[in-house]
Amino acid sequence: MVIQWFPGHMAKATREVKEKLKLVDIVFELVDARCPLSSHNMYLDEVVKDKKKIIIFNKIDLCDRAETAKWKSYFENKGYTVVYTDAKNSNNLNKVIDKAKEELAEKIARQVAKGIKPRAIRSMIIGVPNVGKSTFINKLIKKNVANTANKPGVTKKQQWLKLNKDIELLDTPGILMPKFDNQEIGKKLSLIGSIKDDITPLDDVSLYLIELLKHNYLENLNNLYKINVTNEDENVFIMEKVAEKRFKKIGGDYDYDSTIKLLIQDFRTQKFGLITLDNYSDLLENEEHNEN
């Protein structure tokens, strides 16, 4: 089953982003710090390429900081300004505003030099579903003006919000790519809750999670389930070991349905510890392979 989700409201929101872009000075893109490349919407990136932009690595409290730091450098080397935030706990949010003012300082200075009183900075926030845009906005404004829920598709329309006297923000719904370059992106976005579970092949996603864990966080996997597997073991074998530890057999068979749900839920509730799904060395290997 191919993972794909681009409902009508996302297509409409994409058109509206294009239309409203001329009204804004700067774009904020929220990505999930656990998969900053996979949750970076390259399609929207192309749409907003002529605007100044800040990429916000949100949920920084949930990621493997050492691995995510490599992705921060990756984006900065491409010319982006990157800011870490933990919106849920209100950490580093004001730095985003400070960076926006820095990015637009020359434009504001030119207006002042001409005797023009600078208006409030107009910004737009974009991102795939469930990366924490609404929480980010509510914490920044210090009141609940955007709907929040730990599931995709909660914000369905655009709205202008006043963050403070210096900056206004156009909130937009979560928008996915019309199609994924590869299914690994879809699986990672499924794991962070950007795609609805009821349209996702959770068995494939859970096996993919095992694949990532056994190569990058094997100790976390073994410690959580009190198992002793290696990165050479088959993913289905590892799932059997987890099922054996956590669930009784049903009619002689392992309870795979419960095990699949357990694995995904344990990731989403940080039972494996601090995890970054996007592995920077994988990107380097792919680039080297493409060059050859």
Model-derived features: positions:
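Anionic group-transfer/hydrolysis microenvironments
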Residues: 31-34, 60, 75, 140, ...
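Canonical P-loop GTPase G-domain recognition
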Residues: 61-126, 145
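Short, structured loop/turn "capping" segments at alpha-beta junctions
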Residues: 107-111, 138, 144-150, 216-221
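Alpha-helical scaffold segments in soluble metabolic enzymes
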Residues: 95, 99, 135, 208, ...
